[in-house]
Amino acid sequence: MNRQGKSVEISELSKIFSSSGSIVVAHYKGISVAQIKDLRKKMREAGGGVKVAKNRLVKIAIRDTSIRGISDLFVGQSLIVYSDSPVIAPKISVSFSNDNNEFRVLGGVVEKGVLNQDSIKQIASLPDLEGIRAGIISAIQSNATRLVRLLGTPQTQVVRAISAFVDKNQQG
């Protein structure tokens, strides 16, 4: 790759690092091209991407940024999995790692915070934004249903009491 090509690659990498909500760094030694294509497809469908780049160029791209702490992860055959969502890249990377033993998640960045492998795995276990929204809506709906039942119960009891009183007076 010539100097101009390297410059273009560095600017592409800088754009990925500055605009992504989450970035996962992984080793892919021993992974087939078909498996990498599968990972790329999953990330593309989720709105993210996978980038294989020379470690030296990645280190130059992050040298003067707040995420330069991940530069130590770029040794050997490394790739970057990224997405705008803080959960998507970790979730898909960890899932892919569980299915492919040769693919090893090393660490990454979420919302400009440098994280180790364990933290990335913890984030991967979190529900995505849609799951959180569904949980909140479910909680609100169940509480609203309980409230309606609670408000309806005294009225029902009053009606039953009046009905019993009327029945008693009609009999007696």
Swiss-Prot record:
Swiss-Prot/TrEMBL GO biological process terms: translation
Domain of life of the organism encoding this protein: Bacteria
GO molecular function, a single term: large ribosomal subunit rRNA binding
Cellular component GO terms, alphabetical: large ribosomal subunit
InterPro entries membership: Ribosomal_uL10, Ribosomal_uL10-like_sf, Ribosomal_uL10_bac, Ribosomal_uL10_bac_type, Ribosomal_uL10_CS_bac
Keywords on record: Ribonucleoprotein, Ribosomal protein, RNA-binding, rRNA-binding
Gene3D superfamilies: 3.30.70.1730
Range of residues in the leader sequence: none
PROSITE patterns, alphabetized: RIBOSOMAL_L10
Family: Belongs to the universal ribosomal protein uL10 family.
Subunit structure, interactors included: Part of the ribosomal stalk of the 50S ribosomal subunit. The N-terminus interacts with L11 and the large rRNA to form the base of the stalk. The C-terminus forms an elongated spine to which L12 dimers bind in a sequential fashion forming a multimeric L10(L12)X complex.
Role this protein plays: Forms part of the ribosomal stalk, playing a central role in the interaction of the ribosome with GTP-bound translation factors.
PANTHER family, alphabetized: 39S RIBOSOMAL PROTEIN L10, MITOCHONDRIAL (PTHR11560)
Protein name stated in the entry: Large ribosomal subunit protein uL10
Source species: Liberibacter asiaticus
